[in-house]
Amino acid sequence: MKYTPEEVIQFVQEEDVKFIRLAFCSVYGKQHNVAIMPSELKRAFAYGIAFDASAVDGFGGEIRSDLLLHPDPSTLIQLPWRPEQGKVMQMFCDISYPDGRPFERDTRSILKRAVADAGARGVQFAFGAEMEFY
């Protein structure tokens, strides 16, 4: 289901959400998270949440240290493993520079551009997840 920012904010207020994990992937496929409190969610949707990208391998070191995470409300999920009271939610994020330009090493932006370029050439994609256990 696709949620709007307003629906996410309402859900967080009504459902005893303790914090929200803003997720993104490095260029090496490693998932990273920045946790925010529910009180920071409106600001996250409006302006993004700053993080120190110099600590993320492949993001360019100190040259590109100040980047912003922009949560995508359509990716909202509840993480199932919190043992205490209160819920933990997660959203995947797009990454931008403070001036609003998309960060060129943001894997979500790279994928979106590739899908758009392929679509312009008449190619369509179908994506899915597969669970495997060994």
Question: What is each of the regions a protein language model found here?
Answer:
Residues M1-Y134:
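ATP/Mg2+-dependent ligation/transfer catalytic cores
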